[in-house]
């Protein structure tokens, strides 16, 4: 079984929550367009000035997604 990797985009500022929420829409569109095997996305708000959007990919798709979408960072995903 391959590892799952959580790709993360950071947003800061007063509009960070809305920006992260909107970015998740585009991540879902990318997953559908590229027919990726996992459909795990989300966004989290860490106060008024910081939020993230994320998507989870497999090891096999990590390079493709990283090069196309340029996430700010990544970490291993644990359910």
Feature roles, as predicted:
Residues 2-79:
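Long, contiguous binding/interaction regions
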């Amino acid at each position: 079984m391959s590892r799952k990797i959580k790709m993360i985009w950071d947003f800061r500022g007063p509009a960070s929550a809305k920006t992260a929420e909107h970015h998740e829409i585009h991540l879902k569109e990318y997953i559908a367009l590229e027919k990726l095997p996992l459909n795990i996305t989300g966004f989290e708000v860490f106060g008024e000035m910081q939020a993230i959007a994320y998507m989870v990919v497999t090891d096999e798709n990590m390079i493709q997604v990283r090069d196309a979408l340029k996430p700010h960072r990544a970490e291993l995903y644990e359910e």
